[in-house]
Amino acid sequence: MADINAYEGPAEAGFGDYVALLKPRVMSLVVFTAFVGLWIAPQPVNPFVAFCAVLFIALGGGASGALNMWYDADIDAVMRRTAGRPVPSGRVTSQEALAVGIALSGLSVMMLGLAANWFAAGFLAFTIFFYAVVYTIWLKRSTPQNIVIGGAAGAFPPMIGWACATGGIGIESLLMFALIFFWTPPHFWALALFMKDDYSKAGVPMLTVTHGRKVTRCHIFAYTLVLAPFALWLGFTSVGGPLYLAVSVVLNALFIAGGWQILRRSEDQAQADGYRVEKRYFRLSLYYTFLHFLALLVQHWVGGW
């Protein structure tokens, strides 16, 4: 890692910069999936307790984002997609990012334990550690499997939400985890297909950098095939139902078809049209998880099997 203390910019940060430090776009998916996991769990939760629990899970997700920005300031500075973030742009110092991350980590875990239960709080603490240390500090710069293993951090929130309600883990929460876990690699690899040069310049060993785009295309399609059974299986559990299953069938058919298109594309074709198919698949992947969890929520309201 480069010297993170080099990113010390002037004290010109506004409130929005500190919000950006928490990666609000990423946090929005964390909040939503955690809420769904909590709300569809078999044990009812007081709405105020549910609100507090989701709020503290969101703070934990924000803490992870701040710690990630603290450590990754050097590579963020050389990537077009991330150069404008608060730390590499100099609006927030690296010490401030670290302090915010540590403070929110402690606060979120403590308050979740008091609001819900200590099993869920411990799970949140593990998730923050996994994202900040296992993924950000260890995996991201050391292996092309970084987002495969590290993707677990983004898949834990619905399990944490479920644990807030039940105090434990169920097959339903494990399948929600699996849905996000196996969705993460094709989502990020699709991005890496048209952002390869950025990752290469930053020294991040994404699969496109270490093994090339052809191998990455094969992996994307393979993961769409692995993902589909877990997504569909969820439809036959206590939280599933015909509405969710119908949505999942359509989404997985589109996802597999998109993966097949990517697999069959040559690099010359992709470069000729500016990676149009790859960018379209990436946009589809953004809706894939959100619509699955929205379908679970609606299915819960209308009733399942």
Swiss-Prot record:
<keyword id="KW-0808">Transferase</keyword>
<feature type="transmembrane region" description="Helical">
    <location>
        <begin position="47"/>
        <end position="67"/>
    </location>
</feature>
<protein>
    <recommendedName>
        <fullName>Protoheme IX farnesyltransferase</fullName>
        <ecNumber>2.5.1.141</ecNumber>
    </recommendedName>
</protein>
<dbReference type="GO" id="GO:0008495">
    <property type="term" value="F:protoheme IX farnesyltransferase activity"/>
</dbReference>
<dbReference type="GO" id="GO:0005886">
    <property type="term" value="C:plasma membrane"/>
</dbReference>
<comment type="similarity">
    <text>Belongs to the UbiA prenyltransferase family. Protoheme IX farnesyltransferase subfamily.</text>
</comment>
<dbReference type="GO" id="GO:0048034">
    <property type="term" value="P:heme O biosynthetic process"/>
</dbReference>
<keyword id="KW-1133">Transmembrane helix</keyword>
<feature type="transmembrane region" description="Helical">
    <location>
        <begin position="243"/>
        <end position="263"/>
    </location>
</feature>
<keyword id="KW-0997">Cell inner membrane</keyword>
<feature type="transmembrane region" description="Helical">
    <location>
        <begin position="26"/>
        <end position="46"/>
    </location>
</feature>
<dbReference type="Pfam" id="PF01040">
    <property type="entry name" value="UbiA"/>
</dbReference>
<dbReference type="InterPro" id="IPR030470">
    <property type="entry name" value="UbiA_prenylTrfase_CS"/>
</dbReference>
<comment type="pathway">
    <text>Porphyrin-containing compound metabolism; heme O biosynthesis; heme O from protoheme: step 1/1.</text>
</comment>
<feature type="transmembrane region" description="Helical">
    <location>
        <begin position="220"/>
        <end position="240"/>
    </location>
</feature>
<keyword id="KW-0472">Membrane</keyword>
<feature type="transmembrane region" description="Helical">
    <location>
        <begin position="147"/>
        <end position="167"/>
    </location>
</feature>
<feature type="transmembrane region" description="Helical">
    <location>
        <begin position="119"/>
        <end position="139"/>
    </location>
</feature>
<dbReference type="InterPro" id="IPR000537">
    <property type="entry name" value="UbiA_prenyltransferase"/>
</dbReference>
<keyword id="KW-1003">Cell membrane</keyword>
<keyword id="KW-0350">Heme biosynthesis</keyword>
<feature type="transmembrane region" description="Helical">
    <location>
        <begin position="284"/>
        <end position="304"/>
    </location>
</feature>
<dbReference type="InterPro" id="IPR006369">
    <property type="entry name" value="Protohaem_IX_farnesylTrfase"/>
</dbReference>
<feature type="transmembrane region" description="Helical">
    <location>
        <begin position="98"/>
        <end position="118"/>
    </location>
</feature>
<comment type="subunit">
    <text>Interacts with CtaA.</text>
</comment>
<comment type="function">
    <text>Converts heme B (protoheme IX) to heme O by substitution of the vinyl group on carbon 2 of heme B porphyrin ring with a hydroxyethyl farnesyl side group.</text>
</comment>
<keyword id="KW-0812">Transmembrane</keyword>
<feature type="transmembrane region" description="Helical">
    <location>
        <begin position="174"/>
        <end position="194"/>
    </location>
</feature>
<dbReference type="InterPro" id="IPR044878">
    <property type="entry name" value="UbiA_sf"/>
</dbReference>
